[in-house]
Amino acid sequence: VTTAPVFTITGITVPAGGNAMIIYEAMVNRYAPLDAGSSITNNANISGGGITPVTVDEIVRAQTAPLLTITKSISPVPVTENGTITYTFLIQNGGSADADAASGVTVSDNFDPVLTNLTATYNGTPLVPGTDYTYNETSGEFVTTAGRITVPAAVFTQDATTGIWAINPGVGTLVVTGTI
């Protein structure tokens, strides 16, 4: 959206040598561009009788960083004694930057009950114990190696007719399987 209804404030008197501060807050909506390098520009104008008009611009830039969320599911349900259990971690990146190896992302969990015969994959690729993750079969603590989990940035698309932006998050899937 390049224009919007004008927000007008009237009736403010500023004495000679004085000042006034006007503060307002606006929420970013679905028309705001979110991809890397995007910005929102706000223009303000002061005018009135006997003064020279003043114009000022303020630019707010879209954050360029990963924005990760994680959900965890378990299967099968119900879990059977001495059976195999699978934890699936769906990691989504709604941000405009990749969560790359330099980001140092780790996923950790304490499995209770403790799992034995543990295996793990990330996006279908087997993870190597001791290299890609650590697992303590006594405590149930599982931790991926920093930077092993990478999640691509979201893809932002704007509807040419409505101007509404859609966010398609980058996705990574960690699957941990073991015996209880």
Named regions from a protein language model:
Residues 1-180:
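Exported/extracytosolic protein signature
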